[in-house]
């Protein structure tokens, strides 16, 4: 039976209570307050829902992740990176990045990054939990992504690209820095061919929960605002 959350209680049900069909649906309801979102990521679930639906919280099994040391750079992407066509920055325009990620895609008329979701993650950014990667072609924003950093874990949320390989350059650059800073895992949530091309793989939900327990409160050398690549 699906658990409905109380707005006055931030607790989530145990991850093993998630439904098998649809895979990983853990709870519904609640709100998108910063405190609840922080609690959700620390618990091992994330919000994903369409406009007009209740807030839905997910913890899929298996979970798609990327271990930074397993990053795979294709020959073609390596060539693009060596050409230094794009400039990459961190945390210089979070609002534009999340708005661009929310724009409808050619393969989908609707977006799950609703106005309320954008507001919620902007608040997380103001609190220092959510971060953005911007990819520039001169002064034009052509790609980027955003997610949350907690302890030695980075939780990827969404990316966009308006130029060839722009989001790939942003993601590869992010992983390089996360590796240098001491991060041990990037949560990719759900499998995609794009992520698998970088070396992402699926792990059991319990293994993901073990990573949370071991690394959520560990320090890193992260230095977001000084990074201009």
From Swiss-Prot:
Domain of life assignment: Bacteria
Keywords: Acyltransferase, Cytoplasm, Transferase
Listed GO MF terms: leucyl-tRNA--protein transferase activity
Organism, scientific name: Pseudomonas syringae pv. tomato (strain ATCC BAA-871 / DC3000)
Pfam families: Leu_Phe_trans
An annotated GO cellular component: cytoplasm
EC number(s) from the headed UniProt entry: 2.3.2.6
Localization (cell): Cytoplasm
An annotated GO BP: protein catabolic process
Protein name, UniProt field: Leucyl/phenylalanyl-tRNA--protein transferase
Family: Belongs to the L/F-transferase family.
Enzyme class: transferase
Function: Functions in the N-end rule pathway of protein degradation where it conjugates Leu, Phe and, less efficiently, Met from aminoacyl-tRNAs to the N-termini of proteins containing an N-terminal arginine or lysine.
Reactions it catalyzes: N-terminal L-lysyl-[protein] + L-leucyl-tRNA(Leu) = N-terminal L-leucyl-L-lysyl-[protein] + tRNA(Leu) + H(+); N-terminal L-arginyl-[protein] + L-leucyl-tRNA(Leu) = N-terminal L-leucyl-L-arginyl-[protein] + tRNA(Leu) + H(+); L-phenylalanyl-tRNA(Phe) + an N-terminal L-alpha-aminoacyl-[protein] = an N-terminal L-phenylalanyl-L-alpha-aminoacyl-[protein] + tRNA(Phe)
InterPro entries from the UniProt entry: Acyl_CoA_acyltransferase (IPR016181), Leu/Phe-tRNA_Trfase (IPR004616), Leu/Phe-tRNA_Trfase_C (IPR042203), Leu/Phe-tRNA_Trfase_N (IPR042221)
Lineage: Bacteria, Pseudomonadati, Pseudomonadota, Gammaproteobacteria, Pseudomonadales
């Amino acid at each position: 039976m699906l658990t409905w959350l109380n707005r006055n209680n931030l607790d989530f049900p145990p991850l093993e209570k998630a439904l098998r069909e649809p895979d990983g649906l853990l709870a519904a309801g609640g709100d998108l307050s910063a405190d609840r979102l922080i609690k959700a990521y620390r618990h091992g679930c994330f919000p994903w829902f369409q406009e007009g639906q209740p807030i839905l919280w997910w913890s899929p099994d298996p979970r798609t992740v990327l271990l930074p040391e397993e990053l795979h750079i294709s020959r073609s992407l390596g060539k693009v990176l060596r050409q230094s066509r794009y400039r990459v920055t961190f945390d210089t325009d979070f609002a534009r990045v999340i708005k661009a990620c929310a724009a409808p895609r050619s393969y989908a008329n609707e977006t799950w990054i609703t106005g309320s979701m954008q507001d919620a993650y902007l608040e997380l950014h103001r609190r220092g939990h959510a971060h953005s990667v911007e990819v520039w072609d001169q002064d034009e924003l052509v790609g980027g992504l955003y997610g949350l950093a907690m302890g030695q874990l980075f939780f990827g949320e969404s990316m966009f690209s308006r130029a060839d390989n722009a989001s790939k350059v942003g993601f590869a650059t992010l992983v390089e820095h996360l590796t240098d800073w001491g991060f041990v895992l990037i949560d990719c949530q759900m499998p995609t061919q794009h992520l698998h091309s970088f070396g992402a793989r699926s792990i059991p939900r319990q293994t993901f929960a073990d990573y949370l327990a071991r690394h959520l409160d560990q320090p890193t050398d992260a230095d977001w605002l000084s990074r201009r690549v």
